[in-house]
Structure formats: C-alpha cells, structure tokens
C-alpha cells in the first residue's frame, strides 16, 4: 500500500504508474535533466529539450499531456541515438540502466534507454564495456557531443515548426474574423 504522501499525489490525478514502479523505484515525473536553460531565456531546454512553456506548466499538465511530451521527446531520441549506436544490445542496455537505478517509464523508448546508458558512460567511461552500447570508451565523448548537437538542433526545429503552425492558425483565424 502506498504511503500517505503518495496517496496525496495520487489524489491530484497523478497516475500510480508515474509514482511507483513494480520494484518500488520512484518513476521520473519530469524529463528534467537538471540543467534547465529556459531560465536563461532559451525557448528549448538544453537539458531535457522540452519547450519553455512545457517546463513552466509541467506540474499543471494532465497525464495525457505528459504522455504527449514524453512521446515527442522519446521519438527525437529514437531518431538520433538509434542510428548513432547501431551495435547496441537493448537487453544489455536496459539491464545496465536498471542496475544503475535509473528511473525509466514503463513505455520508455529504445532511444530513451540508449540515452540513459550513454549519459552514464559519459560521466563514467569505465562503465562502457558493461553498458551494452557496443562502443569503445574512447568513442563516448565524441558520440555524446554529436548527440547533443543533433538532438538540440532537432528539438529547436520541432519548436520552430510548432510555433509556425500556431502562428499560421492564428493568422487564419484573424483573417476569418476580419471577413465576418
């Protein structure tokens, strides 16, 4: 049975699977990577790659809104990391990540798991052989740097596209109102 604090969180419509996993690890409720650049004016966080309004309003989002953001972020990780790490063994990667007590959502994508494994290796290169990534420890830093460059470019392009769509819709609505 969950503790009283967890019950309170649950009463605020946070799904149980976001709070406790089957082995009592606390699941991540936010994609935050601990280095938010939106506080300095970035439209896209350089850490988690959420849009600035998503960072600001995250705690007010519904479970469905959270899921939509997670899916976009995971799709971006898949698009960048899966091709960068073609020799990765996902079973070993997942076992490695879980052995380091990294919190993963049950629906975490292959790219999300690769991201956490690469991040662990970037901080501790001696983990590389056990990570399942299929790379040499000397490849970690160049791969991490290339990943960071590509993922931020993709996230920024995604933000720009969303902004252009919203602007186009608003311009269309203004035009319709002016005609009436």
Predicted segments — roles?
Residues 1-86:
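N-terminal cysteine/histidine-rich coordination modules
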Residues 24-25, 35, 46-50, 67, ...:
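Arginine residue identity/basic-tract feature
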Residues 53, 57, 66, 116, ...:
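Histidine (H) residue identity feature
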